[in-house]
Regions:
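Unchanged
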Residues: 45-68, 78-134, 157-162
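Conserved N-terminal beta-strand and adjoining loop/helix that marks the start
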Residues: 1-22, 44
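Conserved Nudix-box catalytic region and its N-terminal flanking loop in Nudix hydrolases
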Residues: 20-61, 149-150, 155-162
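A generic fold-level signal
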Residues: 4-6, 16, 32-33, 85-87, ...
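Low-complexity, intrinsically disordered Gly/Pro/Thr-rich segments
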Residues: 141-149
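Residue-level signal for short segments within beta-strands and strand-turn junctions
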Residues: 13-15, 25-26, 94-97
Length: 162
């Protein structure tokens, strides 16, 4: 069976001092399969859109700011991750400079600045705890990981860097 994932972006907006990250607390829609979890910002890449343009658009739509400086931190394949078992392929970015003032909330939930050293305390997808340290570790090499899910649970995790 061919691998035809949903292509998406996931971005982590850093505060100007680099000590905090803008997270969405998915608390607005009772039918949200991510209800109660914290996550970065992002979403599906649209047809005829490259991943960088998709990341910029998602940050604009979800946070109301413009990305001035981005860095690709890695890619992640999430087989079986979707609500109905769909496969996802994510391009993960940090946004280190932006223009504008972030929104306080959007239709998915509240936007909150969180200290980087407190991220591990938040309710989030189990797998995020494995790859988030790689997003913020300062290693200039992007990581490339695979994290299969089944029934909403991470099954395994592996990655490489080059």
């Amino acid at each position: 069976m061919p691998y035809t994932p949903i292509v998406a972006t996931l971005g982590y907006v850093l505060s100007p001092d680099g000590r905090r990250v803008l997270m969405i607390h998915r608390n607005a829609r009772p039918d949200d399969h991510q209800l109660g979890k914290y996550n970065g910002l992002g979403g599906k890449v649209e047809p005829c859109e490259d991943v960088l343009a998709g990341m910029r658009r998602e940050i604009r739509e979800e946070a109301g700011i413009e990305c001035d400086e981005l860095q690709l931190r890695g890619t992640l394949s999430w087989p079986g991750f979707g609500k109905h078992g769909e496969d996802w392929l994510g391009f993960i970015f940090t946004i280190t400079r932006f223009s504008g003032t972030p929104l306080e909330r959007n239709p998915e939930g509240a936007l909150e600045w969180v200290e980087l050293d407190r991220l591990h305390e938040l309710p989030m997808w189990e797998g995020d705890r494995h790859f988030l340290p790689l997003v913020f570790d300062g290693d200039p090499r992007p990581f490339h990981g695979v994290m299969p899910y089944r029934d909403g649970r991470m099954q395994s995790w592996s990655y490489s860097r080059f």
